[in-house]
Amino acid sequence: GVPETLPTQTGEGLLSEHAAFWENAWQNADVETEGDDEVQTGLRWNLFSLMQVACPGNSDVSISATGLHGQGYFGHAFWDTEIFMLPFYLAACPEEAKSLLLYRCKRLDAARKIAAAEGCEGAKFPWTSAYTGNDVTPPDWAASSKREIHISGAVAYALHNYAGQTGDRGFYKDYGIET
């Protein structure tokens, strides 16, 4: 049968809801340039790509390195999210930024296990992370992965930026400080 979680709306209702979502998203995220249509098109394509790959309110997923544009990296999350993508979400949709940071915070125990396995104290977020938080770096890249020690710093930097830009001190106190 049809899962109960599917909406009971008509096609027109779903289309209307979809259009309203995108109208709001573009109001919050659009950037307009003058003088070069190719630059404007490229900019909007990138903004659209960032908006469509987010999963609002779901802190059990992050954003893969290739988004929805390919199979590269098997859908795994990298530090690129915290450094390169999170600033967009902070400006356009802070709740999504919070969900992305919660993804990391909820995987703190896995990061602690990685650090302990390497003889270190604290937490070491993996270079290539699956939804479990475990290091899923392919064997061919394992040696490089061990040298990629900046990921925890990227996570801390992103948490600090989130708190500073949103003023959400409760989130920082409850999750950020420990992470």
Predicted regions and their residues:
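Aromatic- and histidine-enriched alpha-helix N-cap/loop-to-helix transition segments
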Residues: 41, 75-82, 92, 147-154, ...
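Acidic/polar, glycine-enriched structural segments that form the non-catalytic walls/loops
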Residues: 1-73
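Helix-terminus loop motifs that line ligand-binding clefts
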Residues: 54-69, 95-158, 163, 170-174
